[in-house]
């Protein structure tokens, strides 16, 4: 088995938000992800990079058990959130996903109003007891998603009527309305134009003050701009993980250097 390489910096246990040990994923007989060991830090943006099909999105979905929804998918090894095994039989995946929110590649607002898109999670999780409390949560989430000023006069309008970039910010507001501890983002800018992408990247930088953010991206430039730590996946393995500056300027594994320089991918 190939070694997993880490940066020199020693990370204390209380900085670690999510930890994976020997994480493996199977789709039926296909061994899609092998022996991933990684510590994801609190209030940090971590980027997952690598060629298409390398396992980065598969691993991202492990972190809030979205792979549970895929027939024939099996996850082995151990993944913890604040030290608790998220695959323990006593863990409710729905409650886990309130703590570990997710934003997908393509904006997917519910066929509801802007207001109801954001209010949906707090309602089903019982996070508010009154209309006033729901109003406060909705406004707060839209403000943190940098959408309040554009949406405050049209909260009853369909979320699907927003532009692509606005829809993605609405999906971010929806994800953070349940006060998660971690926000997973699977190529959140791939369907957006450069202006909307820049807005989302600025938002990601602001969100890390409150959340751990994990982003899958095919854009190495984006990973370099928004993340503090980067993990490079290749052929179902985590090849190298460390501080973003080190990964991009002084990678330790030749496969990482080959990918960053464009020789593989």
Swiss-Prot record:
Gene3D superfamilies: P-loop containing nucleotide triphosphate hydrolases. The keyword Signal does not apply. Residues 11-260 form the ABC transporter domain. It is found in: Cell inner membrane. PROSITE patterns: ABC_TRANSPORTER_1 (PS00211), ABC_TRANSPORTER_2 (PS50893), PSTB (PS51238). One of its GO terms (cellular component) is plasma membrane. Keywords: ATP-binding, Cell inner membrane, Cell membrane, Membrane, Nucleotide-binding, Phosphate transport, Translocase, Transport. InterPro entries: AAA+_ATPase, ABC_transporter-like_ATP-bd, ABC_transporter-like_CS, P-loop_NTPase, PstB-like. Its EC number is 7.3.2.1. It holds the Pfam family ABC_tran. ATP binds at residues 50-57. One of its GO terms (molecular function) is ATPase-coupled phosphate ion transmembrane transporter activity. Its main location: membrane. The keyword Hydrolase does not apply. It comes from the Bacteria. PANTHER family: ABC TRANSPORTER I FAMILY MEMBER 17. Part of the ABC transporter complex PstSACB involved in phosphate import. Responsible for energy coupling to the transport system. The complex is composed of two ATP-binding proteins (PstB), two transmembrane proteins (PstC and PstA) and a solute-binding protein (PstS). This is Phosphate import ATP-binding protein PstB.
